[in-house]
Amino acid sequence: MNSIHKQSKIYIAGHRGMVGSAVWRALEADGYTNLIGKTSSELDLRNQDAVSEFIASEHPNVIIDAAARVGGILANSEFPYQFLMENLQIQNNLIDTAHKQNVEKFIFLGSSCIYPKLAPQPLKEDCLLTDSLEPTNEWYAIAKITGVKACEAIRKQYNKDFVSLMPTNLYGSFDNFDLNTSHVLPAMLRKFHEAKENGNTPVTLWGSGTPMREFLYVDDMAQAVVFAVNNKLPEHLYNVGTGTDVTIKELAETIQNVIGHQGDIIWDSEKPDGTPRKLMDVSKLKGAGWKYEIELLQGIKKTYAWFLEHHASLKQVKLSK
Ligand SMILES: NC(=O)C1=CN([C@@H]2O[C@H](COP(=O)(O)OP(=O)(O)OC[C@H]3O[C@@H](n4cnc5c(N)ncnc54)[C@H](OP(=O)(O)O)[C@@H]3O)[C@@H](O)[C@H]2O)C=CC1
Ligand SMILES: C[C@H]1O[C@H](OP(=O)(O)OP(=O)(O)OC[C@H]2O[C@@H](n3cnc4c(=O)[nH]c(N)nc43)[C@H](O)[C@@H]2O)[C@@H](O)[C@@H](O)C1=O
């Protein structure tokens, strides 16, 4: 039985990020009254002692791990060590502390890139570790696989409610719009917007445009987390996505239309394509009772509206070696 109730104390690690902030809003809207969070400057989750002290002083009933070193294809390939090591440090500290201090529920967020590059589509949870990973993000993927396995091991050995959710590519309010480190969707919104403002100049996009990606609006992802808080899920690993995908070229044309840009699109073949396709099989979480609501076009319009309101003060994610 699920031991969590509306007054349970819930610590959202990464509560200022795109996903963490959406989870905070969704839990509040669902009636949860005792949410806590710390910024990375208040609590560096790479520091094991600091994490242990914080959890000992707060005694949360639930930890949601939405803190990570996150970035798009270029950031992942240029900073392999940070994507591997920082993510291992953050998640190991949170998972091990949660286990040792008897936190009742732990929700780990991974990513669809944990699955093999050429796994059969749509990707089922049980194709994990059946083949090689996509090279542009294998470092990040290895960290995330380790997190999934750590939660699975704790669940198996100690029968605890530690569960992993694997989101597909996410987008929405509070996304990262920095053109070097962002994912494709926010990058396209910014590029087409700025090109339109500059008199419909050409927009340069990366790769060939042929890879396929699935996109989930962040508020739908947050509802999946609320679902995992509200229910004791019977298995350790669940994919979270829409179950449909588009080519990067189709995404570009949709965003170009939403923004009303009328210039050319140039494809920069020097930039990587990444994995050809990573469509999620989401039947397990759907079967348990969760489903997405926001279609891609609607989500793009919402995100563009958010961008227009906030782009003067957007966060700039800088990575240093
Ligand atoms: N964005 C996407 O497309 C996808 C994301 N995910 C997963 O979802 C989760 C959230 O991602 P998203 O919201 O997009 O990422 P963001 O970059 O928006 O947020 C990440 C958060 O992690 C926190 N953080 C990073 N390093 C540290 C640290 N050393 N100590 C404390 N906090 C730290 C940051 O805190 P602060 O702001 O205080 O610095 C930030 O709030 C991640 O696990 C990611 O892997 C999975 C699939 C796709
Ligand atoms: C969520 C997921 O995100 C990452 O994987 P990815 O899906 O390959 O990342 P992406 O969103 O950055 O790119 C998707 C596609 O889009 C193309 N593309 C075109 N033009 C731009 C462009 O302007 N910017 C970016 N970033 N990509 C572009 C790009 O070449 C690629 O073909 C993982 O590293 C990993 O972190 C992970 O789990």
Mark where each language-model region is.
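C-terminal substrate-binding subdomain of Rossmann-fold SDR/epimerase-dehydratase oxidoreductases
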Residues: 13-18, 22-30, 194-321
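Adenosine-cofactor binding site in Rossmann-like domains, unifying the SAM/SAH pocket
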Residues: 28-53
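NAD(P)H-binding glycine-rich loop region in Rossmannoid oxidoreductase-like domains
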Residues: 48-88, 97-100, 117
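Conserved catalytic-site region of short-chain dehydrogenase/reductase
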Residues: 73, 108-123, 139-145, 157, ...
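Short-chain dehydrogenase/reductase
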Residues: 84, 88, 136-148, 178-186, ...
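Conserved Rossmann-fold NAD(P)-dependent oxidoreductase catalytic core, especially the SDR/UDP-sugar
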Residues: 92-137
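Flexible, glycine-rich beta-alpha linker
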Residues: 114-116, 139, 163-187, 211-212
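Active-site Tyr-X1-5-Lys
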Residues: 135-168, 187-198
